[in-house]
């Protein structure tokens, strides 16, 4: 069949594997697309090829394209639309292509949840759901769960003779609460919903504990743990073999060899038993007896080698001892008794889960709401039916979808779960060898297991499919990376060839998995990857684990700040693809990646102290923001004014403005009773003269409070919030404070949160406050409102998960010495998709508890899955870098850690030993041992190549490996003693005796005159608009322009002035619409109204600005000849920022300084279009023309042309410099009157 596929066009940019992925057909296809391999482009091209296929074209609505996010779906649609429009340019008469463009908006290109929603909306009558259902808010969902669970448990507690339930409570709850039991029920419910048949999965949990008539050999847990026993015995054998090699060295302790050989024989016996059965190992473990080491005279042998030999032998013995204590200290039948004893308790637990699921579903149904797991299960319910043997098979609806979809394409397939896989299976053909399923993903980037994604689905098909597709599915590897420099790729490959394998890591990092260079970069300086290992400071300044973490974060932040400043200040260059040239690095080119965000605030603080602009999208801190805290206290007081702390906080806040003395005076009027009662009593009496001001403040607030309380009983919560904002003036007040925009954004988020809350099934201020409290109790604080644009020139801090799919020129991966989060392994109960439920055996009567076989097996399985997931997270982090990769980690004792890491140097194979990889507790435990086997670490180690093979030691990668002393990072700047004394004297306003040698210096400083006086009256940095005004100015004095720009003195603060959009604000709003209007859609009133509403939702426009937009004027532009040219242009760029150097005499007409001086000019070009014959520059103007010029536009035209000529000339100059192409035409477009002026030089 392969010869029927279209051949790759000559001169095509596609690689052979990419082309194969574009055109391969006739079977299920799995594309393993490495990071930066262009998978989205391949996916789009495949869709386009199917749509415009000459022999058998497929309508776009006969394709189901499943993406991971809504943003990805929209991007996919946009790319397909752009590609179809290009085809239409070449084939303007093609009705088929026009039809596809019209079908595109209706096409099934969406997330799996959107597809499920589409199915449910179409076939809701097959389900017991209200067709008007809504998607539940996450917090509302959690509150409903708690409500349902509380009711169920209350009923259970009220049942007499409920013996098994109370046994369950005794075993899994504390004396104080049954929170642990609730957590178990909710966890089992959540895990079960990740399976196509939740009840069946729950039943299997119970069946696993029914061991009647079984031996330990029949248990899946024992079979799995035996594999772990073999693994640990093999590790012990490796230690003994290594010890034997050392003992046999010329100056090694040769008398130890005989004992070590006996140890190997003992371990061999245990390993043989492990290959037989659990019982065999148990019996062998009871007979373990280690020989006593023969005494030797240590002075006869190399002392270091003797120590190494004895240490390795002790490690081996510890491995066996651990097995004896954990697994073989109890007889096999006692493990079976655990299962028998726990079986009825687990049965009751599962029954509670089923009752909970039923009640929870019923409550959601009554409230007309569904959650995201419901979407999947309802869709699956519609697409499946039960066969005679009890298995699921496609329903009639599923068969309709099978007939409809010519192909199903799944992006990010590695993040699919079992339920989603079942849905996909029911709408695609059964046979893999004749299938129509196309899957794209990279299992090495599967990092969402915590969301119940199942990378095993991808891995199973990758192992099963072949590259030829013979007899089954086909797999295609896209290994070429078009993102990164060779140094980044080679560095990543070097690490992962050593740490990622099937046994530990779930994936073989073989030749097919390796990243291959696909990008072309100019030669760069200092592009080697780096590992900077910080030795923590020895000073015991900070106690405790939390304090140590703070210090580590500060050390790493200080080092990163130094590196960033050095790179920016030195003009470190990165490649700019748009201009195809190297340019100086900017702050926006840097990203700091962290596994999680606890360190982010400290890192931000340190970078800010160093003068580095930085941004992190923190998931906490919202409710801690002062303005939010104050408002929440206002609402608490409205709900219940008898609460002293919230009321005192409001009275002390800027809203009322009492000081400490006034608050004390109020309390003195009534030492008993609440603050509210005292305030009411105080206001009833006649105030003393000195208390008049206090009385007025309280009376004003008291009256407002009564009005709010009445309003809250009758009106909506969101209206109440806005009323409070307005009547207190607090919203305007915070706008006038530092970071005012951020503060106002935070208050708007509170308002929006209230509106979202009112869209749920809950109502009222009291429930809203409880709703917020539950959010905080669960630690679900939100981040502060976003007040930063994507293009801001700042260093970004984000989690590795957030960075997936992104790329940055310079990447710092920090916190590599932080321990992996293993808290899930420490829980009282464990859940696993395959092994079910595991917990300690707890006997409340005897007050004993001990580990069970199921708990040990699940813990081991989860640990290995965690290790594999962390490897994939590290892979994602390293592959974000385009040009420079810098890895940073902190250790407490570098010498001790290096001694541990150096064990890897004795290993001669690429893949490090399993025990090193599985025993890692942080990323450095993988990275450092890998790099210590490379020649570039020799500057640090000075150990030579030793036994490391040439292909590893001399691998083609460049690294800088360095240990940094933390003391040098935290050392304060030296201060001269003399200078310090002078400062102290000045602070105390003492006369300072002037030494004779200082007299001349003081005189020179006092009499000094600046040599560039001219430059002080002219700015070194100007905007184009300011230069335009300068040219218009008729005043001739040197300082006239600058004086003219000074803000006028206002009689009232701006935030207290009466609001109303200025001409400038209206102009800004129009420009915002012109920037964001979708040129791919028809420009109609309805479309524009929808887009403007979307801009308001995204906070790109305010409500007031949106109301001021004259939509008909925007449409008039696009109906004009110039507007039609914009719609038809090859490319359109809008709101293009630029910076350029300009001779001072060009910017300032009055310049009299040196002729070589330059100034920095900044501006933003409204619109530039590229047409076949060149570039046209367009500037939009909202000047009022009609009625302002008696002679109409004819009189206005020459005036306006002169007014804006300089501005457009500078824009054109900037474009010509950056694009290296002349600007053929410069146009002014005036919305008032729909006028166009072509500006000539």
From Swiss-Prot:
Cross-referenced InterPro entries: AddA, DNA_helicase_UvrD-like_C, DNA_helicase_UvrD/REP, P-loop_NTPase, PDDEXK-like_dom_sf, PDDEXK_AddAB-type, Restrct_endonuc-II-like, UvrD-like_ATP-bd
UniProt key word DNA repair: yes
Catalytic reaction list: Couples ATP hydrolysis with the unwinding of duplex DNA by translocating in the 3'-5' direction; ATP + H2O = ADP + phosphate + H(+)
Residues passing through the membrane, by range: none
Cellular component GO terms held in the UniProt record: cytosol; DNA helicase complex
Ranges where the UvrD-like helicase C-terminal domain occurs: 505-805
Annotated Pfam families: PDDEXK_1, UvrD-helicase, UvrD_C
Protein residues bound to ATP: 33-40
Documented EC number(s): 3.1.-.-, 5.6.2.4
GO biological process, one term: double-strand break repair via homologous recombination
Keywords assigned: ATP-binding, DNA damage, DNA repair, DNA-binding, Exonuclease, Helicase, Hydrolase, Isomerase, Nuclease, Nucleotide-binding
Every UvrD-like helicase ATP-binding domain range: 12-485
Cofactor(s) required, per the database record: Mg(2+)
Entry's Gene Ontology molecular function annotations: 3'-5' DNA helicase activity; 3'-5' exonuclease activity; ATP binding; ATP hydrolysis activity; double-stranded DNA binding
UniProt-listed PANTHER family: ATP-DEPENDENT HELICASE_NUCLEASE SUBUNIT A (PTHR11070:SF48), UVRD / RECB / PCRA DNA HELICASE FAMILY MEMBER (PTHR11070)
Subunit structure: Heterodimer of AddA and AddB/RexB.
Function noted in UniProt: The heterodimer acts as both an ATP-dependent DNA helicase and an ATP-dependent, dual-direction single-stranded exonuclease. Recognizes the chi site generating a DNA molecule suitable for the initiation of homologous recombination. The AddA nuclease domain is required for chi fragment generation; this subunit has the helicase and 3' -> 5' nuclease activities.
Family: Belongs to the helicase family. AddA subfamily.
Protein name: ATP-dependent helicase/nuclease subunit A
Name of the gene encoding the protein in the UniProt record: addA
